Amino acid sequence: MKLCRFLAKGRLHHGVYREGILLDEAGEAHDPEGVTWLLPFTPGKVSGVALNYADHAEELGLSRPEEPALFWKPNNSLLPHKGVVRYPKGAEYMHYEVELAVVVGRPLRRVKAKEALDYVLGYTIANDLVVRDYVSNTFRPPIRAKGRDTFGPLGPFLVVGEVEDPQNLTLRAYVNGELRQEGHTSRMLYSVAELLEYISEFMTLEPYDVILTGTPKGISRVLPGDVMRLEIQGLGALENQIGRASCRERV
């Protein structure tokens, strides 16, 4: 089931997506192009995993991590499907990252990998945007690079009960219709279940917490005006355009 939230005719709706149509609580149909999309749920904590694909580490000239390399993605960065990303004034190199996002369904603490997927509510698509200008200091990745307002597009759906194996999904990222990035979740260094075991060993995960599971190789620069379309097999497509920097927006 593909769950979503949207505004239509001045009202907030919790709906479901079926065969190209949005159905609200009353069963009324809405055109996906005629609504204002919201985040599909209200996220709790949002954690990211850096360098979880060997080919991405290699394209950056970095070593594979010996254990999952975690970071926070602050909630102020989150942006729904079709929301406009704010390009920081003066930024030299900004890029997209298509990622499978895992949504926790019930409290998770010290759970083994073989049981971890039982605690997953569903999955969605994330775009872990980065200004690489600020990934050259000693802390990787710095919040200034990844935690900016609008730098965490998420959605469009919370997909529940449809993903049989999170390690068997194809990921793709397009910029202005051109395929820029393609990978497969089977290439993760640490699987979804292994990540949940690792994180829950020292931190309680709660309902609607989100884990961004890393990106494969294929990053490239994006600029104001570009349209990013991220697709994950069975999860739909997350699309956002990059707007021009505000005169008050600073790197």
What are these regions (language model features)?
Residues 55-57, 78-81, 109-112, 131-134:
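Short, well-ordered, mixed-charge alpha-helical segments that flank or form enzyme active sites
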Residues 89-92, 108-113, 158-162:
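Short helix-to-loop capping/linker segments positioned immediately adjacent to catalytic or ligand/cofactor-binding
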Residues 98-100:
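Ligand-binding beta-strand-loop-alpha-helix segment within the catalytic cores
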Residues 72-86, 108-109, 150-157, 217-220:
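Short catalytic-site patches enriched in acidic/histidine residues
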Residues 2-91, 96:
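Extended, compositionally biased flexible segments
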